[in-house]
């Protein structure tokens, strides 16, 4: 249940209720020792109507003020610096996104996040909102796009001025047999790999790519061996790291 004070969750373990407020979330993130602490916000569905999106943004802005009050009145617990990143919201409405970006830019945080995208809206609308927001957010602070995305999404985000990303896709899709490669997507459950004893990816970015064959990895998935999940996750994470390293090289060279 969500209200002005915060959000009440019911434990899936014992049914107990727990209230998360902006203040409590800041305290938890201090205790965790997060290098980057994220503001407490509402991530409204991408299909939200305008009035709900506007109401949600107002709540997120009020919660942000409470987050900064708590953050500024507490100290790191473990002797190293922690940063608080506010989160731009506003669904797919340009005026709300502009309002949110301007409000957050005024906070002069050490970095800023863009949230509430890749949550059901069309991909082109996501790119449009990134452009709207990054016209406003300062260029000398990291701009972090939350929960995105596919390799193409990441390159398109970089093109539009995004500096940081996070996403479950490399590991979640990997656990389901999907490998991202330099030559496209491979579904390792497919029968086509059954007798393919070539390396997973001969020019891949990870040591697992030449250590195991495609046929063996397919066998592991069909045998429901946990090793399959590990190999696929390692491969996909290495691919994503290779992708952004290549993007960085081309940015520095001026030919991205």
Functional labels for PLM-detected ranges:
Residues 58-61, 70, 74, 83-200:
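Glycine-rich phosphate/ribose-binding loops and adjacent secondary-structure elements
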Residues 1-77, 186, 190-194, 222:
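Non-catalytic, usually N-terminal nucleic-acid engagement modules in DNA/RNA processing proteins
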Residues 29, 104, 254:
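Residue-level signal for inorganic ion chemistry
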Residues 46-50, 54, 111-117, 226-229:
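Glycine- and acidic
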Residues 33, 64, 68-71, 75, ...:
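Structural signal for hydrophobic packing residues in well-ordered secondary-structure cores
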Residues 41-47, 201-256:
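C-terminal extensions of enzymes
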Residues 25, 56, 60-63, 67, ...:
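Alpha-helical packing segments of well-folded alpha/beta enzyme cores
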Residues 19, 23, 54-61, 94, ...:
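Electropositive phosphate-/nucleotide-binding environments in soluble metabolic enzymes
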